[in-house]
Curated annotation (Swiss-Prot):
Keywords: Cytoplasm, DNA condensation, DNA-binding, Iron, Iron storage, Metal-binding, Oxidoreductase. It comes from Acinetobacter baylyi (strain ATCC 33305 / BD413 / ADP1). It catalyses: 2 Fe(2+) + H2O2 + 2 H(+) = 2 Fe(3+) + 2 H2O. It is an enzyme of class 1 (oxidoreductase). One of its GO terms (molecular function) is ferric iron binding. The gene is dps. It is found in: Cytoplasm. One of its GO terms (cellular component) is cytoplasm. Its EC number is 1.16.-.-. This is DNA protection during starvation protein. Pfam families: Ferritin. HAMAP family: Dps.
C-alpha cells in the first residue's frame, strides 16, 4: 500500500480501509475529539467552581464524567491515528474547532453549572447522533456509539439534577 497524498492521512498504515473512507472518518473523528476535549475541560471548570445545594454529589458526579470523557477522547484520537490520520488535540485546535460556546467562568451556583453543562452535553451527544450515519468504518462507529451511550446517560443525570421552577414544572 502506498502512502496517501491526502492532507489528513499522513501516517502510513497497512489498514486497508478505502482512503476516502479513512479521510472522511479522520475528519469526523477530529471534530468529535475537539468537542470531547472541550467538554472534558469545561466539566472540570464546573467541578472546581461550583457552590450550593448538592455540591458534593454533583462535584463527585462530574469527576466520574470527566474520567469517562478522557477514555472516550483517547479512543477517538487513537482511532484517527490507527487509520492513518493525525489526532488534532492541541488547545489551539480545540479552541478553533469545538462546536461548544465559551463556558461562563463567572458562575458558581450548582444549578447554573448544571444548566450550562446540560446544554453542552446535549450539543455533543446530538452531534455524535447526527454524524454516526456518516461513518463507514465499523470500528469508529463502535467508538462513537460507546461515547454516545455514556453522553446520553450523563445528560440524563445532569437534567435530573436541575431543579424545576415550581411555577413552570
Amino acid at each position: 500500500m502506498s502512502k496517501s497524498s491526502s492532507k489528513l492521512l499522513k501516517v502510513y498504515t497497512r489498514n486497508n480501509l478505502d482512503p476516502a473512507v479513512k479521510e472522511s472518518t479522520v475528519k469526523i473523528l477530529n471534530q468529535i475529539l475537539a468537542n470531547l476535549i472541550d467538554l472534558s475541560l469545561l466539566t472540570k471548570q464546573a467541578h472546581w467552581n461550583m457552590r450550593g445545594s448538592n455540591f458534593i454529589a454533583v462535584h463527585e458526579m462530574l469527576d466520574t464524567f470527566r474520567t469517562s470523557l478522557i477514555t472516550h477522547l483517547d479512543n477517538v484520537a487513537e482511532r484517527a491515528v490507527q487509520i492513518g490520520g493525525t489526532a488534532l488535540g492541541t488547545t489551539q485546535t480545540v479552541s478553533t474547532t469545538s462546536q461548544l460556546s465559551a463556558y461562563p467562568v463567572e458562575i458558581h451556583n450548582v444549578q447554573d453549572h448544571l444548566k450550562e453543562l446540560a446544554d453542552r452535553y446535549g450539543i455533543v451527544a446530538n452531534h455524535l447522533r447526527d454524524t454516526i450515519e456518516e461513518i463507514q468504518d465499523p470500528i469508529s462507529e463502535d467508538i462513537i456509539h460507546a461515547a454516545l451511550e455514556d453522553l446520553d446517560q450523563y445528560l440524563w443525570f445532569l437534567e435530573a439534577n436541575i431543579e424545576q421552577d415550581k411555577t413552570t414544572a
